[in-house]
């Protein structure tokens, strides 16, 4: 497995195609959520993706503070259905947190988590803040991780 970390302008056309294909497979088709995944924010993001045999198997995108939330954030966390159960979601989140800690001044991470994944994120050190809300028809919660130490 290869771990790739790139800003948008360094992503190849094939890498972008594979990333968007994975996001669409999971967020639009599997979760039956019709929404505009290509939201105009990818250009500002740092993209972390895991590949195997030229296929993207896990992905997330990172934003610096003020680009998405008040704090740096990790979003669009996704793992290919065929690769689940291998802790790739955890690994891609850890890579994102590491990138933020090493490259951004503000070390805290703010995420908009699908509610059913609250325990997954809690196990990674995120704390629930605020109230539940709907995002694209799916219940979400705001969570923050303090990495300032």
Where are these regions (language model features)?
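Short amphipathic alpha-helix that is part of the acyltransferase structural core
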Residues: 1-47, 52-55
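Conserved GNAT acetyl-CoA-binding A-motif
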Residues: 93, 100-113
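A conserved beta-turn-beta hairpin within the catalytic core of GNAT-like acetyltransferases
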Residues: 65-74, 84, 103-107, 137-139
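Conserved acetyl-CoA-binding loop-helix of GNAT-fold acetyltransferases
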Residues: 79, 85-98
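Conserved beta-strand in the GNAT
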Residues: 49, 55-65, 71-73, 78
């Amino acid at each position: 497995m290869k771990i790739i970390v790139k800003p948008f302008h360094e992503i190849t056309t094939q890498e972008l195609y594979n990333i968007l294909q994975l996001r669409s497979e999971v967020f639009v088709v599997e979760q039956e959520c019709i929404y505009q995944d290509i939201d105009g924010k990818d250009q500002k993001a740092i993209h972390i993706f895991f590949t195997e045999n030229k296929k993207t198997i896990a992905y997330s995108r990172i934003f610096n503070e003020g680009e998405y939330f008040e704090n740096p954030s990790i979003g669009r966390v996704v793992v290919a259905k065929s690769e689940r159960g291998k802790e790739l979601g955890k690994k891609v989140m850890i890579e994102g947190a590491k990138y933020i800690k090493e490259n951004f001044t503000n070390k805290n991470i703010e995420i908009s988590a699908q509610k059913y994944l609250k325990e997954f994120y809690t196990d990674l050190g995120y704390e629930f803040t605020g109230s539940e809300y709907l995002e694209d028809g799916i219940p979400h919660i705001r969570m923050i991780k303090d990495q300032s130490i």
